[in-house]
């Protein structure tokens, strides 16, 4: 069974890379079930998270949320803080797509705190950018700027937009209060 689960996992990953998101989601589900049957709950949860991302890419946020639900707890029990944060981020992304912004914001903030504790700056930066966007949409401009500032602080801004934002935030920080 382990070989079969690995084969299906690889097929699902290949389909995902080819943008066959719905088919990939189905195969990730099959792989998750095989891992579950062999008692490998961590790998099963990882497959559910991959399934969630595939559903989100296919435009089905409700199924994405359902697929990722509870996986953060599996990772928390195993002590894998990084995967726990990623699972929370996947759930938050689905909630955001469903328009459930306060819930999404809460999960993004939990994910950010977990990632900060691991020193994982790139993923945390991505999460903080989502937090910034949600704060801006809710009319909390200063909180949005603070989140974006934090998002760009620990990583080297790569895109022209990020470089401009960094310069603007530096200017604002020098002039403020």
Tell me what each language-model feature is:
Residues 37-38, 45, 74:
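Tandem repeat protein-protein interaction scaffolds
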Residues 29-34, 69-76, 110-114, 119, ...:
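Amphipathic alpha-helical segments of tetratricopeptide repeats
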Residues 1-7, 38:
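TPR-adjacent "capping" and linker segments in tetratricopeptide-repeat scaffold/adaptor proteins
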Residues 39, 79, 119, 156-160:
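Structural signature of alpha-solenoid helical repeat scaffolds
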Residues 6-19, 26-33, 42-57, 68, ...:
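Conserved alpha-helical positions within TPR/SEL1-like repeat arrays
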Residues 105-113, 117, 125, 129-159:
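TPR/TPR-like (Sel1-like) alpha-helical repeat modules
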